[in-house]
């Protein structure tokens, strides 16, 4: 892949930090958004400090940074992070957000990893059997999500019904040879 593109990979057996909660793992996918919101909040808290409101230069710098962050937050649609997180976790039937990863089954771990990856929004998604461990409603949500996905999605799957709903075109790999398939 060309430099500058982000790639996200869903493995069949994802490696997750066993000491974290479900929500902490999912939030890893949007850490840049969380950090930006935290910096914005930190700047807003500084407006009430005398060292800033009594110094016009510091206040101007603070206002300029706040405006930059506001633009970044708006472009990432970060104000809706909590609702996006809740919607994705619910649609993929993730376990309760406070549950420790070490107590999850293989299927639950995979749903958590998929949720984290989809919220991360990499330029290129590599999905290895993405419908494994998903119920029909979760598969339907995933199909709709991938149909609207702004990046490139590459799926390795045996689920032809799923492929029919999400694939723009299919490349069948057989003994090292790629064959376009319609």
Positions of PLM-derived features:
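ABC ATP-binding cassette signature C-motif
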Residues: 1-182
């Amino acid at each position: 892949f060309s430099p500058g593109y982000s790639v996200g990979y869903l493995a069949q057996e994802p490696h997750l930090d066993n000491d974290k909660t479900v929500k902490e793992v999912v939030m890893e996918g949007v850490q840049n958004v969380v950090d930006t919101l935290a910096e914005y909040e930190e700047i807003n808290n500084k407006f009430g400090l005398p060292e800033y409101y009594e110094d016009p230069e510091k206040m101007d710098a603070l206002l300029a940074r706040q405006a930059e962050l506001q633009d970044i937050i708006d472009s990432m649609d970060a104000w809706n992070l909590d609702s996006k997180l809740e919607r994705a976790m619910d649609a993929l039937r993730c376990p309760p957000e406070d549950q420790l990863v070490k107590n999850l089954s293989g299927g639950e771990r995979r749903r958590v990893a998929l949720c984290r990856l989809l919220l991360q929004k990499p330029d290129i998604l590599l999905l290895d059997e993405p419908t494994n461990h998903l119920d029909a409603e979760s598969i339907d949500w995933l199909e709709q999500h991938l149909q609207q996905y702004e990046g490139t999605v590459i799926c390795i799957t045996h689920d032809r019904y799923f492929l029919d709903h999400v694939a723009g075109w299919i490349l069948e790999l057989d003994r090292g040879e790629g064959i376009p398939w319609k």
